[in-house]
Amino acid sequence: MIAAANCLETEKAKLRREIAELQAALNAKEQNLRDLQSRTAASHLDPEADLQHATREQYATLNNDDIARYSRQLILSDFGVSGQLKLKNSAVLIVGLGGLGCPAAQYLCSAGCGNLGLVDYDEVERSNLHRQTLHTVARCGMSKTESARIALLELNPHCRITCYPRLLNSSNAMHIMRAYDIVLDCSDNVATRYLLNDACTMLRKPLVSGSALKLDGQLTVYSYGAQGPCYRCIYPVPPPPEAVTNCGDGGVLGAVTGTIGAMQALEAIKIIIGLGDVLAGRMLIFDGSSCQFRNIKIRSKRPNCHVCSAQPLITGLIDYELFCGMNANDKDNAVKLLEPEERINVLDYQRLMKTKAHLLLDVRAPAEFEICQLPDSINVPLAHVLDDSYLQRFAQQLESKELPIFVVCRRGNDSQIAVQHMRTRLPEHSIRDLEGGLHAWTNQVDQSFPIY
């Protein structure tokens, strides 16, 4: 009886703590909402207000606060007062306030860039916080541009910040970008890269392009100088959608995005003040696993480039989602490879798993399988499933061809690839995909199941 009472007290204490944590989170959300409502009411914003550019002032001198704040870079012989004034009078547009955009914005703002434009359509999520260092737990659910603006003004209240909380596209890109001297591509999708490249080339603005995935990063500057290539000179044709991996699928270490994002800020500063050798016509490749940097030469301008050549074929912005065959965002695109009868929804599977003998294959990588898994699932990574010799050995070990096989992955994309391949190689077996994957399981069946 005493032990049971102690267990009950422990459980009650745990529930009280959870309630307190939820109440604190709710209070923070309500405060964020009040802040946003008060700012909106104060400024009488109209629906297109986020497309109105901040007025750019030109400064001829530094004030005492500038001298005190930027003293450590002012004393650099290659920087000095003239360099600081160029920064103060500059305007930089950052597209994407994620793992690259946050450190880039942070260092540009701290260095004294006078005007920053922030473009991002998304809201802050918990999965962002390990690498997107301007955002906080309290600001989860807030627009990324607004969250970044709050953090940046705490760093440097003298920086003019204009937020564009929307998806950059062919209809608004030229209007937004025209007001800025330099554009930083901190996006995580191919369609936006082509859009930014074409717009920067047409507007004759340098494009500082960074990317990071897993433990690797890349950095270069496009559309800079007479011989500097544009993105299309290097990649005239977009890759097939199935060959593209983003951070959501492949993963990334926060310190890697921080490294590349900080160096994007450095390249922007160099361009603004005319310092050093700008990374145009070259690409910096960072290998985080060995902490090595390599600097490789890339091709010069392509004489027949469709955008930057003397006689371009593309003279206006196009439909980049159509051109690339993928969405202009970093969200995972749901693939549709299977017929409805080749799939099962998670609610039907939940009922079946308790009553019918079957085999559940999880085709995620071992590192992901270790994070969480459904009961009695077997980890067979997708690479193994696509290996015909492995698949034949697997089939030989099955007790019966009558045993139904279900396949699951994180979001229901890789599992479709696996099922499609398995059904052609093992036609005598009943093989179906778990529609929506583990994300659907969390959303529809068990909300306590971890989501990542």
Curated annotation (Swiss-Prot):
In the N-terminal section; belongs to the HesA/MoeB/ThiF family. UBA4 subfamily. GO terms for biological process: Mo-molybdopterin cofactor biosynthetic process; protein urmylation; tRNA wobble position uridine thiolation. GO terms for molecular function: ATP binding; metal ion binding; molybdopterin-synthase adenylyltransferase activity; molybdopterin-synthase sulfurtransferase activity; thiosulfate-cyanide sulfurtransferase activity; URM1 activating enzyme activity. ATP binds at G99, D120, S127, N128, L129, H130, R131, K144, D188, N189. Signal peptide: none annotated. This is Adenylyltransferase and sulfurtransferase MOCS3. It is an enzyme of class 2 (transferase). Plays a central role in 2-thiolation of mcm(5)S(2)U at tRNA wobble positions of cytosolic tRNA(Lys), tRNA(Glu) and tRNA(Gln). Also essential during biosynthesis of the molybdenum cofactor. Acts by mediating the C-terminal thiocarboxylation of sulfur carriers URM1 and MOCS2A. Its N-terminus first activates URM1 and MOCS2A as acyl-adenylates (-COAMP), then the persulfide sulfur on the catalytic cysteine is transferred to URM1 and MOCS2A to form thiocarboxylation (-COSH) of their C-terminus. Keywords: ATP-binding, Cytoplasm, Metal-binding, Molybdenum cofactor biosynthesis, Multifunctional enzyme, Nucleotide-binding, Nucleotidyltransferase, Transferase, tRNA processing, Zinc. InterPro entries: MOCS3/Uba4 (IPR028885), Rhodanese-like_dom (IPR001763), Rhodanese-like_dom_sf (IPR036873), ThiF/MoeB/HesA (IPR045886), ThiF_NAD_FAD-bd (IPR000594), Ubiquitin-activating_enz (IPR035985). It comes from Drosophila virilis (Fruit fly). CDD domains: RHOD_ThiF, ThiF_MoeB_HesA_family.
